[in-house]
């Protein structure tokens, strides 16, 4: 008797609505150059978002402050985990410059978790909001803050 393994050698194709084209286009290249040149991070790149090409071609991005290394190890997240670098206090100024270069009227800012900092990074959120408002007064700012480990004081710093 001969045993034959039976399995489908064809990989099931993802549905069209789930596939995203490789990031290309003039706006994508320009935003990539801005982010790289100003040493900024986006959740788009750090979390390996498949829609980065689409969003960046529409000149939208979610900035990620406080570095690109998270102090938590959430299994669902693609952001790098480990011991983060020191806080870069020039990051808010560079982010505001990037937002101006992108012509933003609405900026979205989030961050990695920084459980290594007493305020969880609240001070840098406040500095970033201030820098954007100072550089682009008409720009609205949305911040997606971490939980600050439940610290009301940290939240008040941001507000």
Where are these regions (language model features)?
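Flexible, acidic/Gly-rich N-terminal and inter-domain linker regions that tether
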Residues: 1-72
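Conserved Radical SAM active-site core
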Residues: 58-159
């Amino acid at each position: 008797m001969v045993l034959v393994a039976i399995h489908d050698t064809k990989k099931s194709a993802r549905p069209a609505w789930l596939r995203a084209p490789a990031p290309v286009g003039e706006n994508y290249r320009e935003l990539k150059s801005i982010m790289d040149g100003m040493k900024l991070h986006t959740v788009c790149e750090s979390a390996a978002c498949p829609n980065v090409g689409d969003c960046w071609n529409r000149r939208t991005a979610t900035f990620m402050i406080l570095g690109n290394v998270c102090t938590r190890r959430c299994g669902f997240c693609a952001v790098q985990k480990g011991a983060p670098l020191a806080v870069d206090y020039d990051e808010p100024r560079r982010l505001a410059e990037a937002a101006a270069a992108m012509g933003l009227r609405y900026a979205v800012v989030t961050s990695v978790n920084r459980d290594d900092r007493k305020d969880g990074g609240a001070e840098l959120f406040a500095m970033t909001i201030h820098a954007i408002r100072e550089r682009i007064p008409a720009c609205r700012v949305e911040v997606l803050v971490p939980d600050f480990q439940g610290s009301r004081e940290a939240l008040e710093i941001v507000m």
